[in-house]
Amino acid sequence: MKKLIVLFVSVMFILTGCKNDLIGEKSNIKIGDNDVEFTLVKDSFTNTKASCILKNKSDKILYYGTPWDIEIYDDGSWKKMNVEMMFNMPLMGLEPGSEKVLNFNWEHTHGKLKGKYRIIKDVYFENEEKFFIACEFEV
């Protein structure tokens, strides 16, 4: 019985430590641009996936790719997560006034999440600097 308790405590310690290892340094990403909305599709998220609507409210084509990241709200600030992901690099364009549903699945990279998070994407308009958009959710 004593060995079983030690094993259980060890496993719990390892699992707790793994979650903390995912939390990285404080994020320096600034979210901006009123001409773009990035919102959660109602009832679309679980602890392993979510869908967000990317809406271009400008009069220019909005460009974006497949890369994305997740940040966690921890101890009063947004923090990066220590997870590396690989992406194909196609470039997509979203016409003015259009919207697109983007689906995200992090089960194999981040596991099952619990807490407050945001999905981060970088986007840009032609001949302009890239900027970041965020879709927040809590599980």
Language-model features: locations:
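Hydrophobic alpha-helical segments, principally membrane-spanning helices and signal/leader peptides
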Residues: M1-K2, V36, V41, K100
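Sec-dependent N-terminal signal peptides of Gram-positive bacterial secreted proteins and lipoproteins
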Residues: M1-L22
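Generic low-complexity, intrinsically disordered sequence content enriched
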Residues: I5-V11, K26, S44, Y117
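Primarily secretory-pathway and cell-envelope proteins
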Residues: C18-M85, V123-V139
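Short, solvent-exposed, Trp/other aromatic-anchored flexible loops in extracytoplasmic proteins
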Residues: V83-K116, D122-E126
